[in-house]
Structures are given as C-alpha cells and as structure tokens.
Amino acid sequence: MVQSNSLSGKRILVTGGAGFIGSNIVDELVKNGSETVVLDDFSTPSVTKFSQDVKVIEGSVENLDICRLATKNCDFVLHLAAVSRVGLSEDNIARCSATNIVGTQNLLLASVENNIKKLVYSASSSYYGNQESPHIESMESEFLNFYALSKATGEELCRFFSNKYGLGTIVLRYFNVYGPRLPIDGPYGLVIGNFLSRKKEGKPLIIHGDGNQRRDFVHVDDVIKANFIAAQNNIKFGIYNIGSGVNYSINELAEMFDSKLEYSDRRPGDSDITLANIDLAKKDLGWAPKVALHEGILKLISEI
C-alpha cells in the first residue's frame, strides 16, 4: 500500500477530508502516524467514520477565519475541498465559484500566514477540454464548463502565491479517479460508481452517448501516493498530470462488468477523450501509477 513514513509525526490538514479521495488519504495518513486534521463542510453525504486520532473541523474553505484555524500549526496542506462535479457546478455557478476559487484563495492566504511548508492542490484534467491527446501540462486551457474554469483559476492562484509569497505549491491534475468510496448514486455519480451500483442491483448499466468516449482512469491509491510525494519534495511550484497514461472507452469499461447495457443521451459538458502524458510526474516526482484498471475494477466488483 501507500507509504508515507516521512510524514509520520507531521501535522497535515486535508480539506475535503470527508469526500471520496480525501477520506482515503486521511486513512493512510492515520495508518502512517501523521497528526491529521480534516476540514469539511459535510455538504455532501459521507459514510466516513474518522479515527478518534483525527481532528475534525466542520466548516467551509469559503470562511477565511476557519482556514486560519485549520492551518494553524500544520506542516502541510492537501487541498481537496471543492464543488467537484461538472453537473453540480453548472447548476450552481455561484457556489462553485465561492468554494473552488474564493475557498482556494482563502486557504492559500491562511497557509502563508501560518508558514505552511507545502500545499498540494487537487486540480482536474477538465483543464484540457477536447484538445488532442495525450494531454501534456504545457498545453493551453480549453474550458467546456464552469467547473474546469474554476479549478484552473485555483491553479493560477497557487502559482501566484508561490511566486509572490514563496509558498511551496504543487498542482496535481487528476484524471478519472476511482476506488473505494467512489460516489455511486444520483446524476453526478462517477461512471464507475454508477456501474457498480447498478450491477449490485442487477440493473442494466446506463451509458450516456454512444460509449465511445475514452477516459484515463487512475486508482485512488496512486493518487494518494502522488499527494504524499508532492508534499515532501523540494520543488517550489509545479503542475503534474496524475493519470494512468492509458485510456479506455466507456464501452470497454462496461465489458469489465459483464452486465446488460442501456444507452441514453450524452451529458452536456463532457469531453470526448482524456489521456494523460505522465512523463513529467515520473521525471520530477518519481511517481508512476501501479494499479491496472482491470485489477482495480475486479476488486471493486468483489466488494459489492
């Protein structure tokens, strides 16, 4: 599993720590002896039960004073708090802006004031839109939705605070993350989560569009590892793709579930292809994904 021994004894703030990726990160930090603080507004349902060793602050990154409180005496910040679905962001642009843009600004301000050693910002492959793949970090942005714009604005805030105030910030552009605690229900559930839910219920899998859209899926264990490496390196600022470097069509993904299929209208704002070029993360961070998609999917299916 993920190793973070050099983070043992360090005080680490995880914003959005009750969410899918954040809660998995918190579990690993606790296992490895880190003093862990969670900041989350619990605005989305969470089944996470934190260890008694975790300090939980219920509040929003939209509140600067709460960000100051949460970052006090911390060594590192792993910033995952966000309105993190395309559909949700389009339905409520004002909230998306307040959380993803103003919230990130608040956390950066508080991190400077409290002398945080490194902030790791969870960004998104939505930055690339429908550009030709594979996607490389030096590409210009192409925003298909407000969520993509809001997350890219957070990247630029990280760059500014690094240049202006010397705050170490690393931006990780996640591709399609999956694993334990993946959202499974509702219109904004992630595709693998929705597939798992419907397979468990014995229902046909719903594919939006023709199923030829291609996605680069990366396991949450590999994302955790990327966060831990990013927090500990000496790079003052950098942007890195965190994906598998391989993509699959939604039809190919569905075949792994051995279920009946139904097709419906494609969702607006979805990209055609995501595919990460991960050469820079390998070179600068020494990071590479380890969990193959077939392996990860079979394990998830065995647990439903």
What is each PLM-predicted segment?
Residues N24, I66-L69, N73-F76, N106, ...:
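Alpha-helical elements of Rossmann-like donor-binding domains used by nucleotide-donor carbohydrate transfer enzymes
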Residues M1-F175, I304:
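N-terminal Rossmann-like NAD(P)+-binding domain of SDR-like oxidoreductases, especially those catalyzing
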Residues N5, K200-I304:
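C-terminal substrate-binding subdomain of Rossmann-fold SDR/epimerase-dehydratase oxidoreductases
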Residues S133, F146, E156-R215, V220-K225, ...:
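NAD(P)-dependent short-chain dehydrogenase/reductase
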